[in-house]
Amino acid sequence: MHVPPSVPGTRARTAHYTSGVSTQPARKSSSSHVEGARSPRIGVIGGGQLARMMIPAAIELDLDLHVLATAPDESAARVSTHVMLGRHDDPEAVTAFARSVDVVTFDHEHVPTGLLHALEHEGVVVRPGPNALVYAQDKLAMRARLSELGHPCPRWWRVETEADLETALRESGGDLILKTARGGYDGHGVMRVEALEDARDWLERGQPLLAEERVPFVRELSAQVARRPGGEIATYPVTESEQKDGVCFRVSAPAPNLAPEVAERARTLAANIASDLEVVGMLAVELFEYPDGRIAVNELAMRPHNTGHWSMDGCVTSQFEQHLRAVADLPLGDTTPTAAWTVMVNTLGSTRENLAEGAREALANDPGIKLHLYGKSVRAGRKLGHVTALGSDLEETERRARAAAHTIVTGDESKE
């Protein structure tokens, strides 16, 4: 299947903001086919930087990208020509938005699964579908399903009571990582637990929790794949990520000194998970690498992911273009790197209120870096943008990327 053009229409030159209200029936369709001569409409729920970075790729593919944002100053809403305002958990807003597009996809995983099932029942095309997306939304469901399928995971426990946690602590040797089953991101919703008292506040909330053994990993890897509705898959080089206070800070592509057989296992694992869960779009499989070369799944994301931002400048086909190709059921693109090494460094929350001066300095210092700012207000620890550097020498390429990011957020030209 593919997404041919549909009814005649023209693209707006300025943003159109509409409220999330509609009395029109849902477009009844079991595929992404649209009729006529207009460009296919791809609807992205969420107005963050991931939706923002899909826009250039949508233009190149002649896709009309529509965004459901909560406010006109969100990252994607600031630059999109088709914006509807409404919350991702408001059934009326989401339904109205879905009825205005041909395919629905996501900037984040937080849309209620029941709402997405209702949309599919009405004939809305949702990619990835709720039966797949639930495994990126609910960590307990993810662990249970991946374990059932035989994919490598850390040892884990479902925790709902103090007795459950005491059992997990005893069986793990008294050292656990406790996670909220839903909603955690960038270090939020995660804590180390060595005694029952450490987690009493979380237990009192009455929500199921995921407890995992504390993995003795040597580093974190990410394997990204894209999958079309018919099953075609494209894999990306496996990357290494560095975290700072639970937030992705640096990504190196490909992962340095990764044994070829480990890289192949990681790519095969990601492809198998995409097939087993029937994911459509991008899938990022975050992995732990053990000292002996074993790998285990950490988390899943069914959308473009921070560990794939390097592909915007360092790959023939970026993850953002690839995601749109997949959800629009277009042939997938080449994932060959365009340089020996690509290093991406996030620009995280700054003491500066405006990054423009630092960005100008960074660009002047190194004309070879690529800069991507998200148009977001400055807040401590917040992802405000990223820089990428490409080169033939890994150490020098990483130095350049780190220096540029440091200059942007501090104005200091010295190496971080």
What are these regions (language model features)?
Residues 12, 16, 25-28, 38, ...:
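Peripheral (often C-terminal) accessory segments that flank ATP-dependent C-N-forming ligase machineries
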Residues 225-229, 287-291, 375:
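Short, low-complexity Ser/Thr-rich regulatory SLiMs
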Residues 135-222, 226-273, 401, 405:
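Active-site nucleotide/adenylate-binding loops and adjacent lid/helix of ATP-dependent enzymes
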Residues 155, 175-178, 209-212, 283-284, ...:
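A short linear hydrophobic-aromatic micro-motif
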Residues 1-144, 148, 163, 409-411:
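ATP-binding N-terminal substructure of ATP-dependent carboxylate-amine bond-forming enzymes
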